[in-house]
Amino acid sequence: MILDYAFNYSKRTLSVTYINESGGKKILNFNVNKFKSYFSTPTGSYLNWDGSRCDVKWVDNPHAFDIRTYMEEMNEKYKKLLQGKTVPRLYTFDIETEISDEFPEPSEAKFPITTISIASPECNVIVLGTKDLGENGVENLQERFEKYLNSSNFFTGLNIQMPYIKYIKFNNEHDMLKYFLEQIVAKVPVLAGWNSIMFDWQYIQNRVRGYYSDISLSSSSMNRTMTQKRYADMRGNEITLNIPNHTLILDMMDVVGNFDMVVMPIKESLSLDYIASESIGMNKIKYDGDLQKLFETDYSTYVFYNAIDSILVQLIDKRFKTLQNIYTQALYCKEKIGACFSKIALTNALFFNYFYDHGVKVIPKKQEDVERGTLIGAYVRTPTPGKHDLVCCNDFASLYPSSIITCNLSIENLVGTFYDEKALIPFKEDKANYIVVGGAVYKNKGTLAKPQLGEFVSYYLLEDELDKYRRNPKYFVSVNGSVYKNDKTYSFKDIQATLKANRNTGKYLAKQLEAVVMTDVDHIIADKAINNVPYAENLVNAMKNIGYNVHCPMDLCNLMDEGLINKFKADLQKEIEYNTSFEQAMKLLGNSMYGGSSHVAFFWFNMALANDITGEARNIIHTMENHIPEYLRENWIDLKDLHKSLGIKVDVNKAKSILKETGDFVKIVYGDTDSLYISYKGLLDSLEGSETMSMEDKTKFIVGLNTGYLDEHNREFMKQYYASRHVDSVQNFELETVALSGAWLDVKKRYAQILLWKDGKTYDIGNLPMKIKGLEMVKSSYPKAAREGLKRLVRYLLEDQTDSFILQRLNIKMMEEKSIFFKAELEDICGNVGVQNYTKYIISDTDPICLKVAPKTPYNVRALGNYNWIRNVNNLPGDPLYGGKVKWYCYYPGGKKHKKKQEPEYFAFQSRNYPKWADQYAPVSREDMFTRTVLDPFNRIMEAIGIGTLKSDGSIQMGLF
């Protein structure tokens, strides 16, 4: 696995670091005077990716692809080193600084760094410091350390040896920083912390620059080279930091916040204490007073506090395992790990690798300023607002990758676009009212300055020219009017098809190794009987890849006799974990390639291709949106064999009555990107005895109809549809969920459902899960108490029968929720929000009269400004805050007596760090918070359903009749 590579132009040295078998890093240095590159020439000996001819040239200044070519053509012994599956050892760190009356700004680094803790993958901790721990200091630390770890179910469940804690005292800060940079940073492969780049690393860098000029920052790199990278801080200011080459420095807060969608989909805060508490059940160390006082009066606890921060980050990585997917993508793409957080870098790598493997060259080009143009987004149907019963979600499996594969869309086979430019002229000139994208015209629902894509008007294409290509099977014509060669499989299709196949292989292999081989290993270790059935070829090959010649369980017994079974088990577990992450990595790569290819930084960027991928995806979902209701409308009554197989009978009179009244048996309620939400109530009502059918029977009917008939029918229909366009369909449009009922608002991507069935599982009728999208109850920005209350209210609404008394019943429930909300902990009723651009909007937070803000200051920035202003003018304790994720609430300056005379103000504070003085200076208004976060969102759902609204005081306005 490649950790990093960098070319030193002055020394003409290409340095490549890789992860060795122990998870450490090794460096390879190659003296390269000139790199092989390619240039365009009609008499060239080689084929360029676009079909033109090219030839070799040797260059001093290599393009990124020239470096990749060099690495591809290395000696095999070096290439083998770069292809190892071992993941890097992750070390975590944290710094503490002295604190005076002001916040230790990392950009200034005025205060000394007091301690630095480093945790290893085994959770061993070293703390660097400049004070004596005192007698028995390390022993006492070890005792507290073990007690802390043993109190965690997550840690004890890891079954690792009890780690140690070690303390190293330095004579001064200078020596401590020198040791940290040279002996820690330069030697570890990956170093991560929490907010570690914008605070810890920036602070260390500026501390060294400002106070210790004899320490070279380049000593933090194993070959003493650095790379400059640009970041934006919480105030919106751009900063440039030097990052060592060959040590990957990560911010685990960023990794968890941006790349985890599984372990914690909802994150109210990105504070270390919150994430650790919610994910691994562990907390930062609590202490009385402030941290500076702790440093001065209880240094042992101060060191312990610092050590635990590093341990928490280490354990969070073990819980989330987000980096495993990044590592696997890096290995598959033959790219350095740090680049694999970028979809664009991954997509470039996949295309380059494909062309290289097929003997096709890539002529480097300079990055040009390209106007991106307008990318048409995914199809989202305007919902039919209201409450709908028995709604199915049918969705496409991997819609965008499948569209690329089906339609053979790629970068090198695009012939051209055939737009009727003459017909488009009046629309292009009328930018206030229209937006032109390729050959498509849309209404502009925005303004001239800020256009916004509105209703589709029409395509304006050169149909006569396109028809020639439509009749020729060697071409594919997109719905947008682009023409692609279709005489063979092209790169994008081939890459996506390979990723899809690899995903299935990795998924199956991981499950088989776990279920078959690992089970046999456990039985042998436990001295249980085993069946000596030979293993399948794929399992034998997998074990051969990790160095074992195992063909059957008896070979495992031989390993037991040789004392190697435990080593084999550990190696097998690593292989299972690799294949599990491999399956996920293939999925992520397949889905991210479309996003990467639609960005101007993509080497082969072409907006026509990006829009064709989206356009074909939109087209097929539109096609199914029309086909399913039409097919059932025309055929349902006559599908006698299907009725028999489902064990039902259709009441023909009822069926005809339904068609006459509604026009269809099924109704499309909503469409979203790759899914259609279809109500089957009309179809059910057409059955004999539908009035007495149980919910279990209704679910069984809908599931049977889809999985036993419609899924395959849809597949066959799409095959025929695409065959008429000269391509082979790999699309699958299948049943995903069946819902008891659901509520849709009159805006896109806002709904809630109660599920009866999902992906083959029928839920117990007394314990039905909810599926919610876009509503406040699943938004991490909403208070915890509000989310929980809204879920209970919406569940009651969806499960209850709509009748003339529903408003009264809901009112009772609402008042119960209000009582619960008013008793909740303060932090649980506060919203969560990120704050940026503080200095852009806050003119002064020290003015003695009031907070000075710029016009149109966002409420969240104002809330944080109020925190700083109240603290500053009243000389109150606490650190200044200028950005990041915070909690917020409404309050009335001057108290409740001023409530009727003014709008509420906003106040913000850090999660789990509420300042007690706010009780006096900014007391929360629970009434306002309840109205804003519970009552108003629930009323919006009730309005969509058409049953009126509720009031905070519990009163109901009833009609006269």
Q: What annotation goes with each model-predicted range?
A:
Residues 1-186, 213, 307-308, 312-331, ...:
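DnaQ-like (DEDDh/DEDDy) 3′-5′ exonuclease domain used for proofreading
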Residues 19, 703-961:
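C-terminal, non-catalytic extensions of nucleic-acid polymerases
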Residues 129-266, 274:
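Conserved DEDDh/DEDDy metal-dependent 3′-5′ exonuclease domain
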Residues 154-169, 236-245, 448-492, 530-585, ...:
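Intrinsically disordered, low-complexity acidic Ser/Thr-rich regulatory segments
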Residues 186-204, 249, 253-347:
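Acidic, Mg2+-coordinating catalytic module of metal-dependent nucleases/exonucleases
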Residues 212-243, 566, 570-573, 633-663, ...:
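Short mixed-charge
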Residues 290-432, 528-529, 537, 544, ...:
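Common nucleic-acid-contacting/processivity interface regions adjacent to the catalytic cores
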Residues 676-709:
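Catalytic palm subdomain of template-directed nucleic-acid polymerases
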